[in-house]
């Protein structure tokens, strides 16, 4: 009986850990990619999250205008980029709240290639 209770508890703990961790699975542009200037930044997570902030900055740290962060809970978010992006390095920093109310943060960079490179 005790062994069965331990198995159930372990199963529950593993399930909760899986639910608790909703990492960023993919992004568009992809991390470290060299791309044409994107029209949007798309983030897809391993589970549903509430996205609380996303910033896009250039190599000087200047913020670029994105859509407002939606208030919905979802796996995928797409935020339009409203400023033209010149060739150079960019960084996306995001923050979300997972289903277990833990805060998840991350960042990735990408490069906008010059039009001659494409």
Kindly label every feature range from the protein language model.
Residues 83-88:
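Surface-exposed, short loops/turns at beta-strand junctions within beta-sandwich domains
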